[in-house]
Design a protein with these regions (language model features):
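Active-site flanking residues adjacent to catalytic metal/cofactor-binding acidic residues
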Residues: 94, 120, 202-204, 230
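Short internal loop-to-helix segment that lines adenine-nucleotide cofactor pockets
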Residues: 71-92, 139, 155-157, 170-224, ...
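Conserved Class I S-adenosyl-L-methionine
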Residues: 244-257
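Short loop/edge segments at beta-strand edges and connector loops
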Residues: 145-147, 230, 262
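Short, conserved loop/helix-junction motifs that constitute active-site signature segments
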Residues: 107-112, 217-224, 251
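Core alpha/beta nucleotide-donor-binding catalytic domains of modification enzymes
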Residues: 124-127, 131-166
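S-adenosyl-L-methionine
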Residues: 1-133, 137, 194-196, 258-266, ...
Length: 311
């Protein structure tokens, strides 16, 4: 068990990397205290993300990532702002590991009525919340599936974490092993079955199974050349018997370049770098998109930094 000092150091180190905390530290503490009280009283909450005209229903769970949405709002993650430079009306966004749907909601507003969002969330905990948020925002351009994506059609165990956003196909031995059986589908098959013949941006956050998802989308990647936002999570990948760099290596073989998002790209101290972070993969021929993303605040090309396994 970690000592209170170690827990504080970890929390403080995390907060210092968050753009929302640095912009408004006092407001972050006040909102966190409010969220703690809401969790004690079992009070579910709806927050407004005014920048995108989005409302988010958040279940009261102190361990859940909902507290970060509540505390940081529009500054929750730099990827949300990045969507504004790579999505526009009429485009198609695929959200793999949608959880409560914050990316789904924001993308839906950005692509408009002429566009479409396809969201996947397998968990019995999170899928009803995703559905509730779709209804809350009256989104008619979202197609949602209770399924996990992989490289082939099958079934598997999804292991629950204290925070539903950490649910994984790979078991964490430090947890109690609560699990549910979920459907696995390849993205290529789902798109074909639903007559979707365009994909512009894919976000993949599946706790280490990113490589499997991308292999199941190989035809779409080669045909549509979408921009991909994916999580680099070597610890979770190892629990699935996958290479930490498997997703990156596969995309590199398809002619993608990489941009590291946010403050993990700027940290000089390896101890303060997160053990997982997000990467944007951009087809080499999409020069304009690469320029827009690379020049966004806090981002730089992946070749200019090092992954944790290289440190």
């Amino acid at each position: 068990m970690k000592s209170p000092l170690k827990k504080f150091e970890r929390t403080w180190g995390f907060l210092k990397t968050q753009h929302g905390f640095r912009r408004a530290p006092l407001l972050t503490f006040l909102r966190s205290a409010s969220w703690y009280w809401r969790c004690l009283s079992g009070m579910a909450t709806i927050v407004d993300l005014h920048r995108w005209n989005v409302q988010m229903f958040l279940p009261s769970n102190w361990h859940g990532f909902g507290k970060f949405i509540f505390a940081f709002r529009e500054n929750y993650e730099p990827e949300l702002t990045c969507l504004e430079s790579i999505l526009s009306p009429g485009r198609v966004f695929v959200d793999v590991g949608a959880n409560f749907g914050i990316y789904t909601m924001v993308a839906s507003r950005l692509v408009g009525k002429a566009g479409r969002v396809v969201a996947f969330e397998p968990s019995v905990q999170s899928f009803p919340v995703l559905q509730k948020n779709i209804a809350l925002n009256n989104l008619e351009n979202v197609l949602s599936f209770r399924a996990a994506l992989s490289d082939k059609e099958s079934r598997a165990w999804l292991y629950h974490a204290l925070d539903p956003s950490g649910n994984s196909l790979g078991r964490d031995p430090s947890l109690d092993g609560v699990r549910e059986e979920v459907v696995l589908k390849p993205l290529d098959s789902v798109l074909e079955e639903n007559g979707i013949d365009r994909v512009d941006v894919i976000k993949v956050d599946v706790e280490g199974a990113e490589e499997l998802v991308l292999h199941g989308a190989a035809r779409s990647l080669k045909t549509y050349r979408p921009i991909i936002i994916f999580e680099y999570n070597p610890g979770c990948a190892a629990r699935l018997g996958l290479s930490p760099d498997g997703a990156k290596d596969f995309l590199q073989s398809l002619g993608y370049e990489f941009v590291v998002l946010g403050d993990c790209a700027k940290s000089k101290n390896p101890a303060l770098r997160p053990t997982y972070f997000n990467i944007i993969a951009i087809p080499k021929q999409s020069v304009s998109a690469l320029v827009r993303v690379t020049h966004s605040e806090g981002n730089r090309k992946f070749s200019e930094t090092k992954t944790r396994t290289e440190l």
